[in-house]
Amino acid sequence: MLLRALFLLPLLALLAGCGCPGYTYRHVPGRTARLVDGYAEAPPDAPPQVHAAIAAGNRIAGLPYRYGAGHGLGEDSAYDCSGAASYMLRNAGLMRGVRTSREFRRFGESGEGEWITVWAKRGHVFCSVAGLRFDTGWTRGPKGPKWTTRDRPADGCVMRHPAGL
C-alpha cells in the first residue's frame, strides 16, 4: 500500500499541473477594459486589434444564445459560444472563418495572452479581452454573448492567444 501511495503522489502532482486555472477578474490600471451598462470600453492605449475585438463583441453582446448559431461569415440574430468567439476574433482581424470550440484548442499560440486569451475545451469556448470575460454562459441572466467580470472555473480548458497579443 505504501509503495502504491509513493507512486501515485508524484503522478497526481504532475496531472494537477495539466489543467488551466479558472478565469479570475483582475483590474490592472491602464490595461483593463471598463464595463459600462453591459458594454466594454477598451483602454485607450490598447493595441488596435483589442479595440476591434471589443467593438465586435459589443455589436453582439446581449443577443440570445442558440446552439449552432453564428457560424456563418455575416451577422446573425443569435450566437453559440464558438460562433461568438469566432465573430469577435474574425472581426478583429485575428482569424479567418469560423471555428468550433474543439478547434479553438489549437488557435494561435499556447498559454495566456497579454491582451486576449481564448479558453477552450471540447464543448465550450470563451475569451478574455483586456481583462474582461466574453462568454455565452456562466453569467447572470439569460445565456448569450456578453461581457462580465464574474469569475468562472475553466476545468478542462486550454489557454490560447493570438500571436503578439
Residues of each region from the PLM?
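Bacterial N-terminal signal peptides that target proteins for export
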Residues: 1-7
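Intrinsically disordered, low-complexity
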Residues: 5, 17-64, 140-165
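Short linear capping/connector segments at secondary-structure termini
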Residues: 37-39, 68-73, 102-107
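...with weaker cross-activation on analogous glycine-rich loops/strands in unrelated enzymes
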Residues: 43-46, 54, 86, 90-165
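Active-site nucleophile-His-acid catalytic modules used for acyl/amide transfer and hydrolysis
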Residues: 58-78
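Active-site nucleophilic cysteine motif
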Residues: 73-92
